[in-house]
A protein has these predicted regions:
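N-terminal accessory segment detector
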Residues: 1-123, 132-148, 154-212
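Phosphate-moiety recognition in structured ligand-binding domains
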Residues: 126
Length: 212
């Protein structure tokens, strides 16, 4: 798939042209450019993850089960932290509506042109896509692998429980309210120790740089 083109007539900067600055001023870009930047970040993130998968697979050798287990643990930790950060940043409600918004924006289902999925009526439907062919994050979720999606649900509301039906690459996840709250998985607890999990973007003025 191809990323959408930036509208040069949209208000704000449409590219990186101009003086060399000390930092990126996101507020200077047009809406169209910011959408493209977000898509590029999602793409870069998935490329980094695929490099992680290749490295783990090389170290695991013939033990594919071990490699899958390690990659799933990594996803579970990141999934829970990312869901919590998205929800907090957007001030979303701790219910199915808030969960639906988080899922649509979550790295697990993005870039949207890469992962075939639909979120509606408290359900997440997934079909086989290029992401499955590449062994990306979504390929680690299935009826037999609930933890990444449960980590997302728990981050929004500990009373939400996920059930998945279908095959390894074509499945439906349903989220329902339960009486007993779930606790964060150990993978999520470990991920929260990272300083990156607590990082917040702050408005900063970009200063011009002079190359000598």
């Amino acid at each position: 798939w191809e990323l959408p083109a930036i509208d040069p007539d949209d208000d704000g900067a449409a590219d990186y042209a101009g003086p060399l600055l000390s930092d990126i001023d996101f507020g200077a870009f047009s809406h169209s450019a910011l959408v493209r930047i977000a898509d590029e970040v999602c793409l870069q993130m998935h490329l980094l993850n695929l490099s992680f998968v290749l490295a783990v697979s090389k170290r695991a050798g013939d033990d594919k089960e071990l490699a899958t287990s390690i990659c799933t643990r990594q996803l579970t930790g990141i999934a829970g932290v990312a869901a919590e950060r998205i929800s907090r940043a957007l001030g979303l409600s701790a219910d199915l509506d808030g969960l639906a918004t988080v899922l649509r924006l979550h790295p697990l289902l993005n870039p949207a042109g890469y992962v075939a999925a639909d979120v509606n009526d408290g359900r997440l439907r997934v079909w086989r896509s290029a992401a499955h062919d590449d062994g990306a994050w979504i390929s680690l979720c299935s009826p037999g692998s609930l933890r990444p999606l449960q980590a997302i649900a728990t981050a929004i509301d500990p009373h939400l429980k996920v059930e998945i039906t279908g095959t390894d690459s074509v499945w439906t996840a349903e989220f329902q309210h339960c009486d007993t709250p779930a606790e964060d998985y150990p993978e999520v607890q470990v991920a929260k120790v990272s300083g990156g999990a607590r990082f917040d973007f702050q408005p900063r003025r970009s200063l011009p740089l002079t190359v000598l």
